[in-house]
Regions:
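Flexible, glycine/small-residue-enriched loop-and-beta-strand segment within the central core
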Residues: 53-126
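Terminal amphipathic alpha-helical/low-complexity segments used for targeting or macromolecular assembly
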Residues: 1-67, 71
């Protein structure tokens, strides 16, 4: 568990640094932590993804639903998210179950990484 918390803290620090380096409107660390919704969404996704992989999909989806209501950003617990994802003006961003988002990706509002297939196959972008 401690390793997981260290990993979470490392990802949060990396993401905050990425925002500070990328967004001139980000004037301090506390502003990023408290007012950038994607930081909150990524925090909840960290836990939801682990629950999803551990065989607890309903609880994972419930956490993801809470995150969506709070942030306006929908990240399926099955999605794989790399380090340094920056979702600027994130309202309406949707990242689907089989999507793989690499390191240091920037997304803006109203982006959907989704698919239309009802088959249980890879159906989201990588």
């Amino acid at each position: 568990m401690m390793q997981g918390l260290r990993e979470l803290w490392g990802k949060i620090q990396y993401n905050i640094k990425r925002v500070m380096d990328s967004d001139p409107a980000a004037t301090n660390v506390w502003m990023v932590i408290w007012t950038y919704p994607h930081i909150t969404a990524l925090f909840w996704h960290f836990f939801a993804h682990r629950l999803y992989k551990a065989g607890w999909p309903t609880l994972a989806r419930r956490i993801a639903l809470h995150s969506r209501h709070v942030t306006g950003i929908e990240i399926h617990p099955g999605a794989t998210i790399g380090r340094g994802l920056f979702i600027d003006h994130g309202m309406g961003v949707v990242i689907g179950e089989t999507a793989i988002v690499g390191d240091n990706v920037t997304l803006f509002h109203q982006v959907t990484l989704g698919g239309m297939s009802s088959k249980k196959t890879k159906r989201h972008p990588t």
